[in-house]
Amino acid sequence: GAVNEVYDLLVEFENYIVGETIIPIKNTLSGLPGTDISEIERVYSKVEALMQASHFLGEHGDWQQISVANTALAAKKILEDQDKHQAAVCSAYAASVYGLSVLADSINDEKNNSTRFIVITNQKVFLKDAKKISICLELPHESSSLYHLLSHFAYNDLNMTKIESRPMEGKSWEYRFFIDFEGNLADPAVKNAIRGLREEGRNLRILGNY
């Protein structure tokens, strides 16, 4: 799933996406050397990593799951606390950096799990050979507003690859939508679709063409 804080930051700051990379994620359960998995009482990691290992963690329902900023900090905490009742959901690399032992390997629910990272700049750069577009816009709380929004992709034969919604602060039942679709800003079909999207929604922003 998406990391919601990233969407919020894209809106807050005038940054632009210029690239993306997909990195395979293989998390472990790691603890202090000499720890037995039966000793574990508390597990630390970022929320997304805990969710990605929900099946494994669910088999140990008595463990307390505690969220921290990221998986590396979780591993660092285990080292600093020196408590064998604690473990971290983290990569094998993070475990090795902080001198932890892997108690269980490949604990992700999805064995082909990966994370998409975006490359951003504060310059308004749209690459000429780009093939993907990211936008965001706001929709009013009105009947069929989302249907009309999506119709512009179908009408212009554009392949939408992702859509996520975030509630708008201070506006009940109104949402900001983040959409990825294939194309280049120079394409006539893309220009026509964006023209229609501006009419359907509010505050449309092109986040990147990469």
Residue ranges of predicted features:
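Domain-level signature for soluble enzymes in the chorismate/prephenate branch of the shikimate pathway
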Residues: 1-210
